[in-house]
């Protein structure tokens, strides 16, 4: 009988320890390395022409207008291929619980129709990022016109 009581107390202490560890484990600070990881993931997804991988970097629940954005991305991948991407991160900041990154972003793409000329777009791309409990994800992207 006393063994059962001791086991029960050990479980309670362990649960209390887990709760206090969770309370002392704050949301991580958004660092330049986090922003580079995200924008590089977008680059890899484009260069491998993997739309699903591209969209996985975004938080569909928190991103304003995500359904329209998802459709815009689908259209972009349908119209273009053979992407080459270059970027240079120029700014990384954190405002409250959100991180932000600005990068000079350049993309070359080949139209799939075989008739239209190749496209080169250059934009100052701004990513707003939020922590989803496991990793940073893009919760907003501007401008979105480079996907047109």
Q: What residue spans do the PLM features occupy?
A:
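Exposed beta-sheet edge and beta->alpha loop/turn motif
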Residues: 97-148
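Hydrophobic alpha-helical core bundles mediating ligand binding, dimerization, or RNAP-core interactions
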Residues: 39, 73, 142-143
């Amino acid at each position: 009988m006393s063994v059962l009581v001791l086991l029960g107390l050990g479980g309670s202490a362990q649960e209390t320890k887990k709760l206090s560890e969770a309370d002392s484990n704050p949301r991580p600070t958004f660092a330049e390395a986090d922003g580079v990881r995200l924008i590089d993931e977008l680059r890899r997804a484009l260069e491998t022409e993997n739309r699903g991988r591209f969209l996985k970097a975004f938080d569909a629940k928190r991103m304003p207008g995500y359904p329209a954005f998802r459709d815009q991305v689908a259209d972009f991948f349908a119209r273009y291929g053979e992407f080459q991407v270059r970027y240079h991160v120029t700014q990384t900041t954190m405002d409250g619980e959100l991180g932000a990154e600005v990068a000079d972003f350049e993309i070359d793409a080949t139209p799939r129709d075989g008739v239209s000329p190749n496209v080169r777009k250059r934009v100052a791309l701004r990513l707003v990022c939020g922590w989803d409990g496991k990793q940073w994800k893009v919760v907003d992207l501007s401008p979105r016109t480079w996907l047109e």
